[in-house]
Swiss-Prot record:
The lineage of its organism: Eukaryota, Fungi, Dikarya, Ascomycota, Pezizomycotina. InterPro entries: NUP88/NUP82, WD40_repeat_dom_sf. This is Nucleoporin NUP82. It comes from the Eukaryota. Component of the nuclear pore complex (NPC). NPC constitutes the exclusive means of nucleocytoplasmic transport. NPCs allow the passive diffusion of ions and small molecules and the active, nuclear transport receptor-mediated bidirectional transport of macromolecules such as proteins, RNAs, ribonucleoparticles (RNPs), and ribosomal subunits across the nuclear envelope. Due to its 8-fold rotational symmetry, all subunits are present with 8 copies or multiples thereof. GO terms for biological process: mRNA export from nucleus; protein import into nucleus; ribosomal large subunit export from nucleus; ribosomal small subunit export from nucleus.
Length: 882
């Protein structure tokens, strides 16, 4: 649940330029038009705020105001500070809008509408803006932001197209909803739903004017609800007058319609959900434009599910003919898509190409109207005639891409977290006039269905098909009984931070609702392989902690219509919602929520609730107080006097006051004008007086909390001892520094003493080099002095090189052998020379140089070995002595 940090900031309040976005127009005279004809303004949804990034579009009467919130905030915060602000400067600032002075980040957009704007609906690509009145629809071609940032005093006039100039007119039924189709090419497919249950699909293109004049598909839901065959006519009648009475005019009166988001799974992106005023809910699937572009995983996932459904229907002998017909129709529909060659079209931004498919013509262009849905586990005390629906909000199921991406776990992990951490069921939220929110689950799942063809032989006296059903998971109220008004029109608004959170806006206030406490636990239970105890755990989940709801704003004054809350999450602006009354903005800034990574499989065991003690709030945000409009409204007395001077009673102003019927009539008219204004001013002054009294109590609370903080600070700094003489802050700081230094020196001395003591009492572990050197010395001692000298030492390694002593013995043996051989050879040579003195050739033909070189080499080796042995002996003697 978000925590409120602050309410409307200074850069949105008067006299800041941001307040001009919501101020009423000076020449707005539309309020008197219904009164002139004796009519009453028909209630309806008020969605007068649309956003595009940090830009917002606000409808005020017949005007649209554009503003860049980031630029308005920056310009207001960077303004030069004023030394004094008085009534003169405030009045001058408030008159800037009337004078039409250009302001950075603010612009007026002129519209061709003839009535007050009720709704603003932004297209998915944020290049079209649908402008709705009670009966008409206009499409505004939004320019680039750079064109709107140009400072100009004149109103901006973008290109406007009238949608259905002969269809959506005042002589026909009112328009209740206009939603952009999530699968439209470049987001340019608009679906309009009128009050008389007529659905029209418009595929808009600025290059073809005809696309704004006629829809590509028009369906009369009253005809479709009574139809029995696929080839019947479901078109809309061209007559503008009612032919006669029909009970469907009451049962099929549409209150609202919506699509799930584009990234939903299954059939959800092409399912239009409709809420009727009578309390019924219908679904139309699949509803597609003539040219549509699916997400990358939509067609493969639908193809896999359809093939599995057809196989299951054929293999199951208990499947009904209706189930087999639906499976075959879905297979025929998907086969036509598979046989198509998609057309590659560049996106509106030009960054990538998209695949465009054509709507299948088989089994038919118009799907079956599914409904009305039955509500399982509906509250027993609820009466059907007491429920009057006003809005519907559908959260689509998460995409099931795990089966399609087997073996591609890396790519699966790289997909968005929201696609994995969601519910595999559609969630349908219904909102009634009384503020009751009903949360339902689509357990069976809405799939594509068509009416049977006429060629199919139906069974005589076949039982009617069971109506689809929705499981009522939770029902709760967002309004008190005293806050319910018959003309109130509550509305849903999505949240920018979570798909499972939304807002409910009503003239009484704004309520935040979050489904996260149970959504992920329910999904974990649905995906669990273990069936033991499932019923118990689901029952515990249903009866346990439900959805979070919190009234974050309450309108204290007389209830006036509030614009549907618009959620904005921007790094420059923060996380907040924006709404508005007829004259002032309503902004609530929240702490940026942490986005925890929810594991794929979470335990359904309810953890123990550990109450964390929050810090004591020494500053609580309070809503901004706006004085009543009666204090700023100009008096009607001067206008009445001017009218009296020019009317037939003007002689009475100059004559002496006399008791007559004419004088009584003048006094009576003047009393009506003055009493109305005085009554409004009295109420406004009384409210202002009560607010001032409340401010005194709030100020006392603030002073009390400040004193508590002061006492805590004095306790920490030591100023709470009243017996001691007063000490200056400088002395306290110096004393604390001196105590800290003494403490540091004491700790350092203690550490040094402990280090010395530890060094004396403990033996330091030998290093690896020291261990290797000791092992080498022990091996040398064993080799030279014998095995007895190495007893009690560490064990030597088995794989050592040849020991020096053995090498010395071998060298000595070789030397003796060579010396003996040399002497023998020399002796043999001498004997040969003596016996044969005349012989010129010796018996051994070895040159003397070679013999001398070999002998020298042998002698050098002997000297090196002797030196090595002497050095080892000396080293061992030193070690033994040490």
């Amino acid at each position: 649940m978000p925590k409120i940090k602050s309410f409307a900031p200074a850069w949105l309040n008067e006299p800041a330029p941001g307040h001009k976005l919501f101020a009423p127009a000076a020449d707005d005279g539309t309020a008197t038009v219904p009164l002139a004809y004796g009519k009453k303004i028909k209630p309806g949804p008020r969605r007068t705020i649309a956003r595009r990034g940090t830009e917002i579009f606000v409808a005020c009467g017949k005007q649209i105001r554009w503003g860049d919130l980031a630029q308005l905030k920056e310009s207001w915060e960077s303004r030069p500070s004023r030394s004094s602000v008085g009534p003169t400067s405030t009045k001058k600032d408030s008159s800037d809008f009337d004078d039409g002075a250009a302001t950075a980040g603010y612009r007026i957009i002129k519209t061709p509408v003839a009535d007050d704007i009720r709704q603003l609906v932004m297209s998915p690509n944020q290049d079209f803006l649908a402008v709705l009145t009670s009966h008409t629809v206009h499409i505004c071609i939004l320019p680039d932001s750079s064109h709107l940032h140009i400072q100009d005093t004149t109103p901006f006039k973008p290109k406007f197209w009238t949608l259905g100039p002969t269809t959506h007119v005042t002589s026909r039924s009112a328009v209740v909803s206009a939603v952009w189709h999530p699968l439209g090419v470049n987001g340019h497919a608009l679906v309009t739903v009128t009050e008389d249950a007529i659905v029209r699909v418009w595929e808009l293109s600025t290059a073809d004017r005809w696309t704004f004049d006629a829809p590509t598909l028009a369906i009369d839901l009253k005809k479709l609800a009574d139809a029995t065959y696929l080839d019947q006519d479901f078109g809309v009648s061209t007559s503008a007058t009612n032919k006669g009475f029909s009970p469907d005019a009451f049962d099929m009166e549409v209150a609202a319609a919506c699509f799930p988001t584009r990234d939903s799974g299954g059939w959800a992106p092409m399912t239009l959900w409709l809420a009727m005023t009578s309390g019924d809910v219908y679904a139309l699937c699949p509803l597609l434009p003539q040219r549509w572009t699916p997400p990358p995983t939509l067609i493969p996932s639908l193809s896999a599910s359809i093939v599995a459904k057809v196989a299951a229907a054929e293999d199951n002998p208990e499947s009904t003919p209706e189930e087999r017909l639906v499976a075959q129709q879905q297979l025929e529909w998907m086969s036509e898509i598979d046989n198509q060659e998609p057309k590659l079209v560049e996106e509106a931004t030009g960054e990538a190409t998209i695949e465009v498919y054509t709507r299948p013509s088989r089994p038919g262009l118009v799907p079956k109207l599914q409904g009305p849905f039955d509500f399982d586990l509906n509250p027993e005390d609820e009466q059907d005639d007491e429920v009057e629906l006003k809005d519907i909000y559908v959260i689509g199921e998460k995409p099931r891409v795990a089966d399609l991406m087997r073996g591609e776990e890396e790519e699966l992990e790289m997909m968005k977290e929201d696609q994995h951490n969601g519910l595999s069921l559609n969630i349908i939220c219904l909102l009634s006039t009384s503020g009751q929110v009903k949360i339902c689950l689509d357990i069976d799942g809405v799939e594509a269905q068509w009416l049977p063809p006429r060629s199919k032989n139906k069974r005589l006296f076949a039982p009617p098909p069971e109506p689809p059903s929705l499981l009522t998971f939770q029902t709760f109220d967002t309004l008190k009984p005293a806050e319910v008004t018959p003309d109130g029109w509550p509305m849903f608004s999505e949240d920018a931070t979570s798909p499972y959170s939304f807002y409910v806006t009503h003239p009484a206030g704004i309520t935040y609702i979050s489904l996260t406490p149970w959504v992920f636990r329910l999904e974990s239970e649905l995906q669990s392989d273990s069936e033991a105890g499932t019923e118990f755990r689901i029952d515990l989940l249903a009866k346990g902690q439900g959805s979070e709801r919190d009234r974050i704003f309450t309108q204290t004054r007389t209830q006036s219509p509030l614009a549907a809350a618009t959620s904005i999450d921007d790094p420059d602006l923060g996380y907040f919602i924006l709404s508005a009354t007829q004259t002032d903005p309503i902004a609530l800034f929240f702490e940026t929520p942490e986005r925890p990574v929810v594991p794929k499989e979470t335990s359904v065991v309810i953890p123990e609730h550990v109450e964390e003690r929050p810090p004591s709030p020494y500053w609580e945000p309070r809503p901004l107080f706006h004085p009543a409009e009666a204090l700023d409204k100009p008096s009607a007395v001067p206008a009445w006097i001017d009218n009296l001077r020019t009317g037939r009673r003007r002689p009475l102003l100059t004559q002496e006051l006399r008791l007559s019927m004419a004088t009584l009539e003048v006094f009576h008219d003047g009393h009506k004008v003055v009493s109305t204004e005085v009554s409004d001013i009295n109420d406004a002054v009384a409210e202002l007086f009560r607010k001032c009294e409340a401010l005194q109590g709030e100020l006392r609370d603030q002073i009390k909390k400040v004193n508590e903080v002061k006492n805590r600070i004095h306790t920490i700094t030591g100023d709470d001892l009243s017996d001691d003489p007063p000490v200056s802050e400088d002395q306290l700081i110096k004393q604390r520094i001196r105590v800290a230094r003494e403490r540091q020196e004491e700790l350092a001395n203690r550490m040094e003493r402990l280090r010395k003591k530890f060094g004396r009492t403990t033996t330091r572990e030998l290093s690896d080099k020291e261990k290797a050197w000791i092992e080498e010395v022990q091996n040398m001692a064993t080799s030279i002095l014998g095995p007895e000298a190495g007893q009690g030492a560490l064990a030597t390694t088995p794989n050592l090189a040849k020991q020096p002593w053995k090498r010395l013995e071998e060298i000595k043996t070789l030397r003796n052998a060579l010396m003996a051989e040399a002497e023998q050879l020399q002796k043999v040579g001498d004997d040969t020379e003596e016996s044969t003195p005349a012989s010129q050739m010796p018996s051994l033909k070895i040159p003397s140089e070679i013999r001398k070189a070999k002998m020298a080499q042998v002698m050098s080796l002997l000297e090196r070995e002797s030196a090595l042995v002497d050095a080892v002996k000396a080293r061992i003697e030193r070690l033994s002595i040490g």
